[in-house]
């Protein structure tokens, strides 16, 4: 199994590469690519970690050597948020980066599963889909917006609030991956009850957790380490499912039946071909139903921007 990390010299990419080097199954190949010349050095550094995962780094304008033969491609390339920016402020730079990288994927490894980490995910996934469609290689079961960070934040904050082991908490998060489009389904957390006040406080905290980190880093970056962990969790789940393990479920932002929007995050059963089944997210509370309905215009607007960028 070959996994390619694109944008591997950045804060997320390096954290993700470190985790994958330690946690990918024995015999896996890990390819690191970034435009930055430091990338082969990042791979050399990680190659000294004694795990049965081979690693190679590539830099320069062309990601093709890193992409050749890849089963999974995780894209974290782009610029990070700074204080005062929201994820959509990143669009002007990151849209072009995702477009050109996806064009290379369409030619080099069109059958790979692609996980998009680069923000704004609500929009960059739509860009990737349109690029792949134009190239005649789009498979909606193999393109994912990685929203796992919203899930792990939800699990962490719920565990803290309720004094539970975070490893035992499961919180489905639906919708999109920015602001009001992030909807944690707190009503579905098993073995935990929330007051209306707790839900009203916890929901926006999860939605704005990225801003919390950006401000805490005081201009020194955004959420890179927790995002690296989230992307590793999703990447490893993909690898397990592609290898034939059954019952692997993660929330991700994918093209489904279009009930709410063309792309929508919800629980996904992963399989040998990517999305095996888009699972029902069950019944919503009145609070969640209202939040869902009020976010849809924002989400659909984000998607439209991505679609129009490629036209």
Swiss-Prot record:
Task: Name the keywords, alphabetized.
Answer: NAD, Oxidoreductase, Tricarboxylic acid cycle
Q: GO molecular function: any one?
A: L-malate dehydrogenase (NAD+) activity
Q: What class of enzyme is it?
A: oxidoreductase
Pfam families the record matches: Ldh_1_C, Ldh_1_N
Has the keyword Oxidoreductase been applied to this entry?
yes
Question: What GO cellular component term, any one, is given?
Answer: cytoplasm
Q: Which residues bind substrate?
A: 81, 87, 119, 153
**Which residues does the annotation say bind NAD(+)?**
7-13, 34, 94, 117-119, 227
One GO biological process term: malate metabolic process
Active site, per annotation: 177 (proton acceptor)
The EC number(s) this enzyme carries? 1.1.1.37
- Reactions mediated catalytically: (S)-malate + NAD(+) = oxaloacetate + NADH + H(+)
The record's listing under InterPro entries reads: L-lactate/malate_DH (IPR001557), Lactate/malate_DH_C (IPR022383), Lactate/malate_DH_N (IPR001236), Lactate_DH/Glyco_Ohase_4_C (IPR015955), Malate_DH_AS (IPR001252), Malate_DH_type1 (IPR010097), Malate_DH_type1_bac (IPR023958), NAD(P)-bd_dom_sf (IPR036291)
User: What superkingdom heads the lineage?
Assistant: Bacteria
Q: Which PANTHER family match?
A: MALATE AND LACTATE DEHYDROGENASE, MALATE DEHYDROGENASE, MITOCHONDRIAL
Record note on quaternary structure: Homodimer.
Give the protein's function: Catalyzes the reversible oxidation of malate to oxaloacetate.
Q: Which HAMAP family match?
A: Malate_dehydrog_1
Give the protein family.
Belongs to the LDH/MDH superfamily. MDH type 1 family.
Q: What is this protein called?
A: Malate dehydrogenase
- Its source organism is Aliivibrio fischeri (strain ATCC 700601 / ES114) (Vibrio fischeri)
């Amino acid at each position: 199994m070959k996994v390619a990390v694109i944008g591997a010299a950045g804060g997320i990419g390096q954290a993700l590469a470190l985790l994958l080097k330690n946690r990918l199954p024995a015999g896996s190949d890990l390819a690191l690519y970034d435009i930055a010349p430091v990338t082969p050095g990042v791979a050399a550094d990680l190659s000294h970690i004694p795990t049965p995962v081979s690693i190679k780094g590539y830099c320069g304008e062309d990601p093709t050597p890193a992409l050749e033969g890849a089963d999974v491609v995780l894209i974290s390339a782009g610029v990070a948020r700074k204080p005062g920016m929201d994820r959509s402020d990143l669009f002007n730079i990151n849209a072009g980066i995702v477009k050109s990288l996806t064009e290379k994927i369409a030619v080099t490894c069109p059958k790979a599963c692609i996980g998009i980490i680069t923000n704004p995910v609500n929009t960059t996934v739509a860009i990737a889909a349109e690029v792949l469609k134009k190239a005649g290689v789009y498979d909606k079961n193999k393109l994912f917006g990685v929203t796992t960070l919203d899930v792990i934040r939800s699990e962490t904050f719920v565990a803290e609030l309720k004094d539970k082991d975070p490893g035992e908490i499961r919180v489905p998060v639906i919708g999109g991956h920015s602001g009001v489009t992030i909807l944690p389904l707190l009503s579905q957390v098993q073995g935990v009850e929330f007051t209306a006040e707790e839900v009203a406080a916890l929901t926006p905290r999860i939605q704005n957790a990225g801003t919390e980190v950006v401000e805490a880093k005081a201009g020194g970056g955004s959420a890179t380490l927790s995002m690296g962990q989230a992307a590793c969790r999703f990447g490893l789940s993909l690898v397990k499912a592609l290898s034939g393990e059954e019952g692997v479920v993660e929330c991700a932002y994918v093209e489904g039946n279009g009930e709410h929007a063309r792309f929508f995050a919800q629980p996904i059963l992963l399989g040998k071909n990517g999305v095996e089944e888009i699972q029902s997210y069950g019944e919503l509370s009145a609070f969640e139903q209202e939040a869902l309905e009020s976010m849809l215009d924002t989400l659909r607007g984000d998607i439209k921007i991505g679609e129009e960028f490629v036209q």
